[in-house]
Amino acid sequence: VIDDQQGNAEYLVGCLNETGNKRRADNVTGLLGGPEFLAYLRAQKEPITKGFFMHVGIDDFGAINSSRGADYGNYILKSVAGCMKECLSDKQRIYHLVADQYVIVDLEASSAEEAVALKEKITDKLHNFIVDENYEAIFSISIGVIDAATFCEGTEECRKKFEFALKQAKSMGKNGFYIFSNLDY
């Protein structure tokens, strides 16, 4: 609030999504969140039969926040989101879930190779970002991928497999990449 000379409120400065409505976009990354991700999937006119969900997590993100502070951590979150967004096609979408986790949605892909290619593109983009930042923060991402048709099994089962895929990727070490398999589940 900016007051006039008499001490009365003259201007109110803020973001439009802070006016009392439930927030849709994340203030740090500018991305839509989990509820919008689910709404997008539920709005599909045809059952989802192809594509993938890519669950992305920044490895050891807590260490960045601890050593450099929350403002720098937020800068990394926004930068990672921006790098990933630049790698997407017009048919792909990205959402910020929680903390250091994102989901990339592709409902058109017909093979796992397309997820692998996107992962490589994102990894290269993030490497270039780290170099451009003079290695101030060195980090990697882990990625778990599930078939988008898993959504048709119900949101709870989809969530479990989605979380499992990222957990498996992270268990492989930094920069892990895992494509869901029922044999491991």
Model-derived segments and spans:
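Short loop/turn elements at sensory-signaling interfaces that couple input to output
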Residues: 1-12
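Cyclic nucleotide signaling catalytic output domains
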Residues: 94, 121, 125, 136, ...
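Sensory-module boundary signal marking interfaces of small helical input modules
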Residues: 5, 19-22, 61, 112, ...
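Sensory beta-sandwich core in regulatory modules of signaling proteins
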Residues: 13-14, 53
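PAS-associated C-terminal
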Residues: 17-18, 56, 107
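Residue-level recognition of strand-loop junctions within catalytic nucleotide-signaling folds
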Residues: 66, 105-110, 127, 147-149
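Output-coupling edge of small sensory domains
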Residues: 1-3, 17, 128, 146
